[in-house]
Amino acid sequence: MIVNRFSAQFLSMTLAAFVAVLFVAIPAHAQDAATIYAQQCTSCHGAKGKGDGPAGQYLNPKPSDFAVSLKGKSDDWIAKAITGGGSAVGESPVMPPFASLTGDQVKALVDYVKHLGS
């Protein structure tokens, strides 16, 4: 019984340390970008940026696959698409603008979607 209690405590402490290391290893802006993406983008663009989110199937035109749509695009172009919506960059007006994001959030999100598209 003492061994089982020790094992449970050791496992709990090891798991807590592992989770703490994960959050330290991932830059804060990347964590923020992942959260923003999950809340604002996943429903249309999908978790992996393939344009296959659950709401995306009902949109016309379909949401873009970042691997295709971001190829050759500058960070400024991507930021403008995020803050101004699709029509701000000559793309689908179905994508809404996210003008309330801070500059740091937009930069982090640009990096995040570029990573998804790579």
Task: Please give the residue ranges for each predicted region.
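Bacterial N-terminal signal peptides that target proteins for export
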Residues: 2-16, 24
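Electrostatic cytochrome c docking/interface patches
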Residues: 21-36
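Short, solvent-exposed loop/helix junctions and linker helices
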Residues: 30, 71-72, 103
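Extracytoplasmic/secreted proteins, especially bacterial periplasmic and envelope-associated proteins
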Residues: 32-36, 77, 104, 108
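Gly/Gly-Pro-rich "capping" loops immediately C-terminal to redox-active cysteine motifs
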Residues: 34, 50-80
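The canonical Cys-X-X-Cys-His
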Residues: 37-47, 109-113
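Axial heme c-ligation environment in periplasmic c-type cytochrome domains
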Residues: 57-67, 83-116
